[in-house]
């Protein structure tokens, strides 16, 4: 769910939702309807789009509302992954419980800041990370759409069959992103599900779990693989970060 929310948010942010709708046939109508109703009178100034100058005013209005709607949902679904995986050490991404919704402020590291956007109708201050019934329904539909999209699955299986996080070719080492290092330049050790890895070992265990997210028969390992796919996208200890 964390990956799905990120994909949609980024597509919305850069005005590329048509990639999902037209390119992959992902039905975004439930999200669009929810966003237009929930943020009907909200200009969503903090969620303006970047890029795509060809957007007309109507599309722009709808997309900024979708951008805000999926951003709030992303905060909520990511908190569930973070809670389930304390070893990821990503608690700092959980921000909703630091907000004073009456004052419209957030407290970070002991300092209070005013929020630029104070309209969060789907957040319950007592349970800020709980999805509303509508948000849960939207995520369930999106999950089914992504999982049942034949074209998307075909593209992902192509990447898994042909690609890897690193490759030795013609005497050269090719690798994605950056190898995590300590300040002294030595390889940084990163804990993945209770075990420490660094360098080549880190690349191999992360790739192994990505593949498990698609192919593992053990439900626990498959779930861990899905969580790792989200982790490698945004953790500072991930080579792909």
Segment roles from a protein language model:
Residues 1-241:
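Feature recognizes metal-dependent phosphohydrolase scaffolds
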């Amino acid at each position: 769910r964390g990956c799905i929310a990120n994909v949609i948010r980024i597509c919305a942010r850069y005005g590329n939702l048509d990639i999902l709708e037209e390119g992959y046939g992902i039905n975004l109508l439930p999200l669009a309807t929810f966003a237009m109703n929930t943020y009907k009178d909200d200009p969503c100034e903090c969620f303006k789009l970047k890029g795509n100058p060809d957007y007309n005013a109507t599309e722009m209005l709808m997309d900024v509302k979708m951008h805000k709607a999926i951003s709030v949902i992303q905060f909520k679904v990511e908190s569930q992954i973070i809670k389930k995986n304390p070893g990821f050490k990503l608690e700092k991404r959980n921000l909703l419980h630091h907000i004073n919704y009456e004052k419209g402020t957030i407290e970070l590291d002991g300092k209070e800041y005013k929020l630029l956007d104070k309209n969060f109708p789907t957040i319950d201050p007592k349970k800020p990370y709980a999805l509303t019934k509508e948000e849960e329904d939207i995520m369930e539909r999106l999950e089914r759409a992504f999982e049942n999209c034949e074209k998307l699955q075909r593209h992902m299986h192509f990447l898994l069959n042909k690609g890897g996080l690193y490759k030795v070719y013609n005497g050269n080492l090719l690798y994605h992103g950056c190898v995590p290092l300590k300040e002294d330049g030595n390889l940084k050790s990163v804990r993945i599900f209770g075990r420490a890895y660094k360098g080549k070992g880190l690349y191999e265990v992360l790739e192994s779990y990505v593949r498990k997210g698609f192919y593992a028969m053990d439900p626990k390992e498959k779930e861990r693989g899905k969580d790792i796919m989200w982790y490698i996208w945004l953790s500072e200890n991930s080579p792909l970060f």
